[in-house]
Amino acid sequence: QTPLAAAGSATAVSDDLTGFAASACRVPLAESWLVGGASTTGANDLVVLANPGTVPATVQLSVYGAQGVSNPPGGSNLVVPPGERRVVPLAGLLLGEESPVVRVVASGAPVHASLQASLTRVLLPGGSDQVAPLAQADASLVIPGVQVLTTGEGQAGTVLRLLSPGADTTATVTMIPLDAASAAPEPRSVPLTAGLPTSLDLSGVAAGAYTVEVTATAPVVGAVWSTTGFGEGADFAWYAAAPAFSASGVIAVAPGVGASVVVAGGTSDATVTLTPVEGGDPLTATVGAGASIALPVGAGVYRLDTDAPVRAAVSYSADGALASYPLWPADAAASAVTVLP
């Protein structure tokens, strides 16, 4: 089969909803994690379940919050018919939760899960985003392209949310600046209690773009939230962990201002080439072991080739607009995937 890649973006401009959001199509999963959103006052977040298969899927939603894990009735035995999607308000699963993490388990057929997040602060829209899923908990997370832009008075402008689902552990958080001339902040240790989400303020560093790496002694899930500000015209993004990209594949860059492909190196240097599928000059760069680079790109489909494992994401940063989505390797051997609108 021929590998496929697709991505989309949207800008909301209304009295009660603003912001830029972008996301990529990816294969459905039997299990996934949604790290992001809230169910407190001002948040209007929706869990979206799509079934591109030919048989019904039955989905169980578990929510991790300040009191541990819960299995709310509104998230039990949710049937998603083939070729359709189902939307579940996050507040209907666990009301008043500041740092929820949702585990999605599907039987009968895999589903694609995502989180539509939007925020209002005292009647002032604070942005919107589409939160990408994680396939599984892992003892090592790499989150490329996080933009640290601002801090408000008494408010954190960039926050890492972590959860260790199964065991108490300690996570080490390292921030790697994309600007090679910038000094990296000191790594930080974060104790995690099993089943309880934990937030870490990352905004006390120099403004700029970073790759956030998390290592722990037990599997964890995590994502980073960042905002352009706390006033009129603000937007935010949730940055999800990216899986390893170890060979070649096609990727899609959705339309948007300030787009770049951010590549985080692994344990060895990697030469990365982006080649426009519809023609054009390839872009080749070397990313050092443990380093990160940003490759400015326009909208389109590209072939990504690398000679060593890397992690990558598409990141957008412009005035009043933030968005990001991780790049997953295309599985050319997988069965056909139908993309739902």
Question: Which residues make up each language-model segment?
Answer:
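Short acidic, flexible loop segments centered on an aromatic residue
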Residues: 49-70, 106-107, 154-181, 216, ...
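Conserved functional hotspot residues at active sites or interaction interfaces
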Residues: 9-48, 112-166, 221-268, 311-341
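Intrinsically disordered, low-complexity linker/loop segments enriched in Gly/Pro
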Residues: 31-40, 54-80, 88, 139-150
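Extended, compositionally biased repeat/scaffold regions that form elongated interaction surfaces
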Residues: 24, 106, 129, 138-166, ...
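Intrinsically disordered, low-complexity Pro/Gly/Ser/Thr-rich segments with frequent PxxP/GP/PP motifs
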Residues: 68-101, 181-209, 277-301
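Hydrophobic, ordered structural segments
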Residues: 1-19, 48, 52-57, 79-126, ...
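C-terminal beta-sandwich/jelly-roll accessory domains of carbohydrate-active enzymes
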Residues: 218, 268-269, 276-286, 291-293, ...
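Long, low-hydrophobicity ectodomains and other hydrophilic envelope-associated domains
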Residues: 1-8, 261, 272-274, 304, ...
